[in-house]
Amino acid sequence: MDQKDESSSRFWEFYALRYSVGAVLGGLILFLLVQQSQPISSLVFVKSGEPIDLIQVGIFLAAGLVFSYVASAPILVLHAGRFLIQRYTLRLQRPSKSMVWFLGLTLVIPVAFLSLSAMSALLRIWFAVVIFLAVAVVLAQFFIIVKCLLRSSDLYGFYEKLANKRSSAKGGIVDSYRHLREQGNAFGILFFQVVLGLFVFAATMFSSYSNSFQSQSPLEVAVILVLVVLTWILPAALVWLIACMIEKEFVES
């Protein structure tokens, strides 16, 4: 097998590793959402508390693969903005303005919810933690997108150097860091699946918990799910702008 065929084979191995486990976990998360969330179960073919057959298991696995792909959206943004990673020493340093803004904006919504919500203390804490995780994941991606667009020259310089280095390297260090990164991607996707699952559950159940378990119509639940998915994938969709910026720098260089 030549170098090109070997690279292609490993490319598909990386994707198989990344999404095979994610499909199983995604199917499990969707099954739990259907079983535990009455609003979501009203939209699908399986009702809460009912047993499922093998065909439905297969459908859950297929849906879990889609869920895994959607949940992996933040990985794309992190991958695009990896040139922003810097070397830091262990000594304490003053946080940057971006970090201060990020922490402030991430904390303001869950803190406001804790202060203003009329739910019980346990429910307030649970919802606040989920809100914090969701806001942190989404907001961090917007910060990365903005920094990539503002530092387009550094962005292009990184990818240009990377392309030159890779063209002259065969195996060795390239295969090593790719293997490590893809293993990290696989576990990162599992993490983001859990966060997205909590986000979906909290968003669809919030009205029920805040209104004495008043049921929602299927249309209301569908609208909530669409808004959650759009919020989750919007930063990843903006990576298109980063790719166009790299292309523009390439043409003008």
Predicted features by range, described:
Residues M1-L17, F45-V46, K161-I173, F250-S253:
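N-terminal juxtamembrane cytosolic/stromal segments of multi-pass membrane proteins
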Residues F14-P39, D53-Q86, K97-K161, D175-E249:
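Alpha-helical transmembrane segments and immediately adjacent membrane-interfacial amphipathic helices
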Residues Q38-K47:
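Extended intrinsically disordered, low-complexity coil regions enriched in Ser, Thr, Gly, Ala
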Residues Y88-Q93:
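Amphipathic, cytosolic membrane-interfacial segments at TM-TM junctions
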